[in-house]
């Protein structure tokens, strides 16, 4: 198994625009960090954890091949804003999105053009083909050859 940390920065990335702190003013390349995301890969499976606004830039550095699933930890913009940029990966087939129900509902509200109601809207050309899958804490599920067990953690005061 290979885990690539695509981004380890804050919700604004590092450096933060307008910040004069030592880290943000640093010329050290280690102080230039994109927003949080990770790529988990085995010989046959590729999973993205969170898909923020830096997704496209992050993936330009990776081999272009199928993404078997995307795990979304929570609905914050810095974890979901790159979902529309999954479009090129849809040439391999629909992309499975895995999240808790509240996150799935937030995605439907924020990106209704990606998740049409069967009776009302239809996908128009160029929209990423995303399928929502609800996951539950402490219930193992499978993506490819990986078994995944979601756990609850604290994100400041919010449980995710």
Q: PLM features: residue spans?
A:
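Binuclear metal-dependent hydrolase catalytic cores
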Residues: 1-160
